[in-house]
């Protein structure tokens, strides 16, 4: 596990939601909220973790809450999203639409044909 803040200083909770909105890298979220993470898990599942965190945050009502409570809830949500993917493969959760729409157990829809890429390349091969 990686401790995001090497000096383990307290998390700055002032205006935390607006600060989180300005972040882009997953590591920045863990650093801002003071949460630990395993870089190996983050390397594989960062987009899934961030998407799931967004889903969890969207379900929360932070209006009229003090910044300290918002920061604590946001950290708990980040840790929950992280744990979702730390113990299982990202594909098993299907957080993205393309994964939700694709069921590997469902046969290909009749009438849809898969054309191998090799069939396109053959006319361009040197003889």
Swiss-Prot record:
One GO term of the biological process aspect: nitrogen fixation
Alphabetized UniProt keyword annotations: Nitrogen fixation
TM ranges: none
Keyword Protein biosynthesis: no
Coiled-coil annotated spans: none
Superkingdom of the organism of origin: Bacteria
Subunit structure: Homotrimer; associates with NifD.
Protein function: May protect the nitrogenase Fe-Mo protein from oxidative damage.
Family: Belongs to the NifW family.
Protein name per Swiss-Prot or TrEMBL: Nitrogenase-stabilizing/protective protein NifW
Organism (species): Rhizobium etli
């Amino acid at each position: 596990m990686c401790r995001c803040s090497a000096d383990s200083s307290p998390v700055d909770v002032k205006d935390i939601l607006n600060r989180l909105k300005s972040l882009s890298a997953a590591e920045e979220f863990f650093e801002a909220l003071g949460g630990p993470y395993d870089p190996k898990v983050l390397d594989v599942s960062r987009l899934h973790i961030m998407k799931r965190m967004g889903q969890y945050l969207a379900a929360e009502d932070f209006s009229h809450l003090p910044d300290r409570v918002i920061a604590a809830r946001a950290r708990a949500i980040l840790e929950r999203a992280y744990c979702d993917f730390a113990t299982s493969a990202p594909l098993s959760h299907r957080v993205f639409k393309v994964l939700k729409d694709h069921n590997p157990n469902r046969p290909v829809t009749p009438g849809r044909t898969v054309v191998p890429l090799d069939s396109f390349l053959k006319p361009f091969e040197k003889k």
